[in-house]
């Protein structure tokens, strides 16, 4: 796995390191880890954020869960909504990094930072899924959320 957890999530060059395939698999791995039926997803205004959010939502929903699109919002709003709704959440943003980067910042239910154990578990799930999922995930496979 080329990308691994840094502080609260993963970051990389959008569509090069942080590919749609990786983002969809990240979503599935996170959904499997939390076994949650509902997720919140927010994003920033980067050009890559909307398509990445769509693939992320597909991954999160692949285990039968529901995904709520918060739209373009600041990261603290995603954390606050996660806390209020007691749902895990993901923010698609690379924060202060350059425009070509993007990232996935994940919050546990209640807006909490993930434990090291949860991060390691998600990383292992991603590694396992990357080995078993076909190499090409096309834009047509991403359904709007």
What are these regions (language model features)?
Residues 21, 86-88, 94, 118, ...:
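Mixed-charge, polar/low-complexity N-terminal
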Residues 21-32, 76, 80, 120, ...:
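Short, contiguous clusters of charged residues that form electrostatic/catalytic patches at enzyme active sites
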């Amino acid at each position: 796995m080329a990308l691994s957890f840094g502080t609260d999530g993963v970051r990389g060059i959008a569509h090069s390191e942080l590919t749609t395939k990786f983002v969809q698999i990240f979503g599935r791995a996170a959904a499997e880890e939390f076994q949650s039926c509902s997720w919140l997803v927010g994003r920033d205004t980067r050009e890559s954020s909307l398509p990445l959010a769509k693939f992320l939502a597909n991954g999160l929903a692949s285990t039968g869960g529901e995904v709520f699109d918060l739209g373009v919002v600041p990261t603290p709003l995603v954390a606050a909504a996660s806390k209020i709704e007691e749902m895990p959440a993901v923010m698609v943003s690379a924060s202060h990094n350059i425009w070509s980067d993007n990232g996935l910042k994940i919050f546990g239910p209640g807006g909490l930072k993930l434990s090291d154990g949860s991060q390691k578990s998600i990383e292992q799930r991603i590694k396992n899924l990357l080995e078993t999922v076909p190499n090409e995930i096309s834009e047509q496979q991403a359904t709007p959320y």
